[in-house]
């Protein structure tokens, strides 16, 4: 597990250190630096993987603070067991974790797929059909049963060939067994929940999964269920091994289902626009009093602006 990370002159992160928990939630307004943090947690995705001589990474100017490649760029990760990894312009960089970045696209999730083996969900979710197809029959049945529990308008999920020679998902209507709906006929939330449910069955899971705006199109009840699913994956209760998660959100509702110590509030410094990361001061008496006054509503505390991460406050 990544216990902490330090960013130096990386995108919007001029000099930022932050600790991570098994589940960490980044919250803040638009352009507050959440995407920069997620990119820095997945250097193979955000920074050119091409390597020059002497094992030195080629870092594009767009990845530097203010796009100034003369700055001393660097990212350092601290893992459990006193292990560490780093990425910089110096020779001999090391990366000790594998990241699966997810920015799920609703149109991509609905796409037909050319039949192929797919053991992990792609960043946009465009291979969801193939990922579901690759699952064992028992795993498919488990995913279908869980989806139908969470979205009780359906009684099954299946695959069907299309006229184009591809295949696509289909959803059986709960009240009419002869009626099967295509992905274009079901809700956005249905497609997103299905994508989240298949993550637990990836045979070679990443060490870290990052998700941008997981709350989109989900009923508050489903947000609670999603966080419970993620917690089970972080402990290894489900899945091949424990997986760490970092979520980026604008949702006060989602904050109601996580713990204060799991949240990082992001803001921009008014002087130079650099990102600032604050943790909830859970150990202070004042915080505990405020938390009680807000009836332990983390979303309400965030919207009040008292802990940062709100535009103009």
Where are these regions (language model features)?
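Phosphate-coordinating catalytic segments in nucleotide- and nucleic-acid-processing enzymes
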Residues: 45-204, 297-300, 313
